[in-house]
Amino acid sequence: MATRYASLDRGQCEAELGKRHIAYERVGEARGVIAPLRLKGAIAGIDFHSMLPPAQRRTSPYEIYDCRLVLALDDWARVLARYDVVEVVHYSVYRPPPAKQVLNGAGRRHSGALAIDAAIFKTRDGQTMSVEKDFHGRIGSKPCGTNAASTVGLPAQAVTLRKIVCEAAEAQLFNVMLTPDYNWPHRNHFHLEVTAGARWVLVR
């Protein structure tokens, strides 16, 4: 699915948002972002937002998403709902490029608002799952698929976090999915990315 979304232009993507009844505000321009927007509510019942206080989120550039990432998050929301997740707190989506940096085309990953660093998951009953504290990753281990690391003996929240990632990977909701098993910089979040032009899925 991520491959299909990555090929959409702004008009096609926004038309799909309309079909899905996703509330958003169009952003006129955000450097490096093809289809910038701000969310105006939950996506399929799940609230995605940064760690900023609510009053700051309304104008912060860190709350800008590319439309194509939002479509992928809408699909992922169906997976999250199976585990009673109602809120996802991220460390980063859009990282504006420096003003003096010359851009050659659209940005990628965070510079194009096409990636989210999901860090904290809150459930309907008030529980919180932190990737940093609850995933229990091991660098070099395989989180999903054939030869994935065993979950025997892991706490329930660690198992749930793996299911959240691996079910998304199986459905190919994102092109790139990096977990704490990948390296130290990803110890505290899941990096989930829609990659323009990609016809592959990488899960580490």
Language-model features: locations:
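Active-site acidic/histidine clusters and adjacent loop/turn architecture
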Residues: 4-90
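Short, solvent-exposed polar/charged micro-motifs at secondary-structure junctions
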Residues: 34-38, 96-102, 188-191
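Catalytic cores and adjacent binding grooves of peptidoglycan-active enzymes
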Residues: 37, 74, 107, 112-204
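Mid-length scaffold segments of soluble, non-membrane domains
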Residues: 61-90, 96-128
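An acidic- and aromatic-residue-enriched active-site/binding cleft used to recognize and process polar
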Residues: 85-93, 134-136, 197
